[in-house]
Design a protein with these regions (language model features):
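Loop-to-transmembrane boundary segments
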Residues: 31-53, 188-212
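Juxtamembrane inter-helical linkers in multi-pass membrane proteins
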Residues: 172-194, 265-278
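Perimembrane loop-to-helix junctions flanking transmembrane segments
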Residues: 65-87
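C-terminal transmembrane-bundle signature of multipass membrane proteins
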Residues: 200-293
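Alpha-helical transmembrane segments and their membrane-interface junctions
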Residues: 54-59, 130-156, 206-232
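Membrane-water interface of transmembrane alpha-helices
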Residues: 9-17, 59-67, 95-110, 161-182, ...
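Alpha-helical transmembrane segments
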Residues: 80-95, 145-168
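N-terminal juxtamembrane cytosolic/stromal segments of multi-pass membrane proteins
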Residues: 1-43, 262-293
Length: 293
C-alpha cells in the first residue's frame, strides 16, 4: 500500500515543497538558463543553438557515411576502425536523424510564448533533456566505433556493462534520492539488480577490462580485426566510456530539474501564491503590461 502511494510523480503540494525552492524563479536556480526565460528575445536568441545541428549531423551522419563508403580515407586510426564507425552510423542513422528533427522542432516552438512561467520552465527543461539525448545518439557511431577498433568487441561489451553501473549510480540512484527527499523517507537498501551489478563491477570490472584489452593484443578471440591497434587508437578507445559518463551525469541532474519543474507545473497556482510571484515574472513583461491596462 505504501509502495503504491509513494510514487516519484505522486507527491502532494506540501511534500513537493521539500525539493521545490524559490531559486526555481531564477535562471541560475533552474539550471537551464535562458530556456526558462519568459522574454521573447531571450528565447529567440536560442535559435543559435540550432547551429549545433550542423555538428551533430556531421559527426553522427555525414562522417559515418563517408567512412563507410571510403574507410581508407581515415588517417588517424585504422581502416577497420573507420569501417566500424560507418557500420554503427548506418544502423543509428534513422534515430540520429529523428533526434535532430525533434530537437529542431522543439527549439522553434520554444520561441512562441507559453501560458505562464510554469509552462515555460517545464518546456525548457524537456528541451534541454532532448539536447543531451541528441548529443548522446549523434556521438555513438564515433565513440562506439573507436572503442571497438581499439579494444575489440569483448572489451566494448565490458564497457557496456560498466555503462549499466553508471546508469545505476548517476540516474537511478539520483531519482531514488529525490523520491526519498519528497517523502522524507530513508532509502532502504535492497538486493536488486543494481546492487548486484555494482558489486560485480567493483569486484571484476577492472579484471575484465584488462583481460579483454589483453585479448585484443594477443589472441583476438571473437574479434573481426586481427591487427593490433596503434597508440592513438588505444587512447581513442576510452572516448566512449568517458563521454557517456559526462552525458549521464548531466542527464541525472537534468532529470532532477525535470521533477522539480513537474511539481512546480502541477501545483502552479499554489506555488504562485506561496512564492508571491508577480505578474511580470509569471506572464512575461509584455503580457503583464497588457493585462494591467
Amino acid at each position: 500500500m505504501m509502495q503504491t502511494k509513494n510514487k516519484l510523480f505522486g507527491a502532494s503540494f506540501e511534500q513537493s515543497k521539500r525539493i521545490v525552492k524559490d531559486d526555481i524563479l531564477t535562471e541560475e536556480g533552474t539550471q537551464i538558463g535562458s530556456f526558462s526565460s519568459m522574454s521573447f528575445w531571450n528565447r529567440a536568441s536560442l535559435l543559435l543553438v540550432l547551429l549545433a545541428n550542423i555538428i551533430t549531423y556531421g559527426v553522427g551522419i555525414h562522417l559515418p557515411d563517408s567512412l563507410r563508403d571510403a574507410p581508407e580515407s581515415i588517417q588517424v586510426v585504422s581502416e577497420s576502425t573507420g569501417a566500424q564507425i560507418g557500420e554503427v552510423g548506418f544502423f543509428l542513422r534513422p534515430i540520429i536523424f529523428g533526434a535532430i528533427i525533434l530537437f529542431t522542432v522543439l527549439v522553434v516552438l520554444n520561441i512562441f510564448p507559453k501560458i505562464n512561467y510554469a509552462h515555460q520552465l517545464l518546456y525548457g527543461t524537456i528541451l534541454m533533456i532532448s539536447f543531451i539525448f541528441l548529443v548522446a545518439v549523434a556521438t555513438l557511431p564515433l565513440t562506439v566505433g573507436l572503442t571497438i577498433g581499439a579494444f575489440g568487441i569483448v572489451a566494448f561489451v565490458v564497457q557496456l556493462i560498466f555503462s549499466g553501473y553508471l546508469v545505476k549510480i548517476l540516474i537511478i540512484d539520483v531519482m531514488k534520492e529525490v523520491k526519498a527527499s519528497l517523502y522524507n523517507e530513508k532509502e532502504i537498501k535492497s538486493k536488486d539488480w543494481g546492487i548486484l551489478l555494482i558489486n560485480f563491477v567493483k569486484k571484476y570490472g577492472g579484471i575484465l577490462i584488462g583481460l579483454s584489452i589483453l585479448n585484443r593484443w594477443t589472441f583476438n578471440f571473437g574479434e573481426f580485426s586481427k591487427s593490433n591497434p596503434g597508440l592513438m587508437s588505444f587512447l581513442f578507445g576510452w572516448l566512449y566510456i568517458g563521454f557517456i559518463s559526462l552525458l549521464l551525469l548531466a542527464e541525472g541532474q537534468l532529470l532532477k530539474c525535470l521533477i522539480k519543474a513537474f511539481y512546480f507545473f502541477k501545483y502552479r497556482k499554489e506555488y504562485r501564491e506561496y512564492f508571491n510571484i508577480k505578474d511580470e515574472q509569471w506572464y512575461g513583461k509584455f503580457r503583464a503590461r497588457f493585462m494591467s491596462k
